[in-house]
Regions:
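Active-site/binding-pocket entry motifs
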Residues: 9-12, 41, 59, 193-196, ...
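Short, solvent-exposed loop/turn positions at domain surfaces
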Residues: 21-22, 88, 127, 174, ...
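Non-catalytic DNA-recognition/assembly elements of restriction-modification systems
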Residues: 9-11, 101-116, 128-173, 182-184, ...
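A short beta-sheet element
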Residues: 5, 24-76, 189, 211-213, ...
């Protein structure tokens, strides 16, 4: 029988099994509400395959006066409040005592169902937009393979060059914690770079002074439009092609910087080449025990296809068309997410 661990709660299935005897009351069924009680306090509906409750996983069984879907939408608000108040050492822990103290606004059942139905419809629209983005990403991947083949196996037998032969590969100059400010020039970490790679709006949380920024630029230069930046922990290939002239700086080591030096390469082609290399062969490129990280020396050695620039430019034109579609979908998705936040605030405070 599958055994539910905390990591399984959100995804709704388990790949861990037990042969021990169990009581029927510990069996979790489809759509049962579960909460992970360590780390991030997530609530989710369980998937189709029955499984067993495990330690640090809590099942919620609402009473007759509470609609299950209403409870599902209310609980993230309550859990977030508890999480914010919970002391952080290494991993946050949620206690049964704290759960039992949660006060749930008990509205008439019909009203509860109406609230849950409204939020469910918004969730369906959000999921649809996310599926559209995923399909557009698949379209790009298919087009790349069609034109150039898989970067790992090179079925078209392109000649290759090490990345360091066509680009400068490095990072930034170190900025110390005490040098960070509450305003000024935005300072991006891997988290923000990853979000920008996904074309999400980023609100900077950290800054450096303009004077400090100028000093850093004199020492290391600054990213230009068309340069590539990526988080050092990047198994999903989140690479940002710089698309702004606005000043910013970034964290050394945690963000890698690629600046093309060859006129025979297109930045868009290079982005998707590295994305393909990283996503299909991350284990052999990255290093580290806890979190495998991309290192500058390894990135320099990455092999890049030596293909005609005309072909690269054709691919870049295709990407431009797809990106316009993605931007439209992404804007719609962000509006839906804002709508859901507003509704959650209206319903649950």
């Amino acid at each position: 029988m599958p055994l539910i661990r905390i990591r399984d709660v959100v995804r709704g299935y388990s790949e861990t099994y037990t042969t021990e005897e169990y009581k029927s009351e510990y069996i979790v069924h489809e759509n049962d509400l579960l909460i992970g009680m360590d780390g991030e306090f997530n609530i989710a509906k369980w998937g189709k395959t029955p499984a067993l409750l495990n330690q640090r996983v809590c099942r919620l069984a609402p009473k007759d006066s509470i609609d299950k879907d209403y409870l599902f939408y209310f609980m993230p608000v309550a859990l977030k409040r508890i999480e914010e108040k919970t002391p952080f050492v290494t991993v946050k822990h949620l206690s049964a005592k704290e759960l039992n103290k949660i006060e749930i606004p008990v509205l008439p059942l019909e009203e509860q169902r109406k609230i849950a139905e409204t939020l469910s419809k918004v969730d369906e629209l959000i999921a649809f937009r996310e599926q559209q983005l995923a399909k557009l990403d698949e379209l790009v991947k298919a087009r790349f393979v069609e034109m150039f083949g898989d970067c790992k196996t090179n079925p078209k037998n392109w000649k290759t060059k090490a990345l360091e032969k066509i680009a400068n590969v490095g990072s930034s100059k170190r900025v110390f914690v005490e040098e960070l400010q509450d305003s000024g020039i935005p300072f991006y970490r891997g988290t923000e770079i990853g979000a920008l790679a996904e074309k999400k709006a980023v609100i900077p949380a950290l800054f450096i002074t303009e004077e400090h920024y100028k000093q850093l630029c004199e020492t290391t230069g600054k990213p230009q439009k068309g340069d590539l930046l990526m988080p050092s922990i990047c198994p999903d290939g989140r690479i940002w092609i710089v698309d702004t002239d606005e000043p910013f700086y970034f964290k050394d080591g945690r963000v890698l910087w690629v600046h093309l030096t060859s006129a025979n390469y297109n930045s868009v082609f290079l982005l998707y080449t590295l994305k393909d290399r990283i996503m299909t062969d991350y284990a052999s490129i990255a290093s580290g025990t806890t979190f495998a990280e991309l290192k500058i020396f390894a990135l320099k050695k990455c092999k890049v296809f030596d293909v005609p620039l005309e072909l690269q430019n054709q691919f870049a034109t295709f990407i431009e068309r797809v990106d316009r579609q993605k931007q439209t979908v992404q804007q719609s998705l962000e509006k839906l997410e804002l709508m859901k936040k507003a509704l959650m605030q209206e319903y649950f405070g």
